[in-house]
């Protein structure tokens, strides 16, 4: 029971009303000054796009998908304890800059034994990303890996998931996020099968890339010409 006269802050009620247990990200709807957050079970796969993002965009549009917003640069910074505890346990703590928005994300360990990657995801917007990063560092977390991508998000009316095109320094990828049945059906419609599914993170994919290209930088960022 709450002690008499002790009321939670007003934004707590707004946050409580905004909890959504659903598939799919709604981060694109965040405004940095809103105390809004989501809790969800994220289910997704990646697909490598050897023919490039433009060919994939045309393919999505042929199947009724439309971009929900402009192509946008996202800069992600993950944080971990000095021991690497989060990475070792399959968890992730990430601060994302996307346009004028800052988004903080926690992801839990992925469920084992599935061809899709399913994990708990909690997201919220913050108004000052630099200040939030300092708070994390004061709590003992340190920057662990940074990566960039140009992302375009697509949705088909009435469908249960979203598709994103990611143009990264190591190639172009498509992410399909939604219920497992929707992922499998959509991947098949686009010409992909389970053998094409990638459940690795961009951090893992970049580690594999660095083992072949030893001179590339530590972080996955676009290099100036």
Regions found by a protein language model. Name each.
Residues 5, 18-21:
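Short, positively charged low-complexity motifs
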Residues 163-170:
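A contiguous pocket-lining binding segment that forms or flanks enzyme active sites
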Residues 183-190:
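Internal alpha/beta scaffold segment
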Residues 27-36:
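N-terminal, intrinsically disordered charge-dense segments
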Residues 39-160, 196-225:
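N-terminal strand-loop-strand beta-hairpin
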């Amino acid at each position: 029971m709450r002690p008499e006269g002790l009321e939670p802050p007003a934004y707590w009620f707004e946050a409580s009303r905004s909890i959504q247990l659903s598939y799919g990200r709604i981060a694109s709807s965040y405004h940095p000054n809103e105390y809004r957050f989501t809790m969800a079970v994220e289910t997704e796969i990646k697909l490598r796009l050897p023919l490039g993002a433009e060919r994939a965009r045309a393919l999505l549009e042929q199947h009724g998908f439309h971009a929900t917003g402009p192509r946008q640069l996202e800069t992600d910074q993950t944080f971990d304890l000095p021991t690497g505890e989060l990475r070792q346990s399959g968890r992730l703590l990430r601060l994302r800059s996307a346009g004028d928005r800052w988004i903080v994300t926690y992801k839990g360990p992925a469920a084992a034994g599935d061809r899709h990657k399913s994990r708990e995801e909690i997201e919220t917007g913050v108004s000052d990303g630099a200040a939030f990063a300092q708070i994390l560092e004061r709590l003992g977390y340190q920057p662990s890996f940074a990566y960039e991508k140009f992302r375009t998000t697509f949705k088909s009316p009435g469908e249960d998931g979203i598709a994103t095109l990611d143009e990264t320094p190591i190639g172009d990828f498509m992410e399909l996020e939604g219920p497992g049945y929707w992922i499998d059906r959509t991947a098949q419609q686009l010409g992909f099968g389970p053998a094409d599914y990638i459940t690795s993170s961009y951090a893992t994919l970049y580690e594999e890339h660095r083992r072949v290209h030893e001179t590339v930088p530590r972080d996955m960022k676009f290099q100036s010409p």
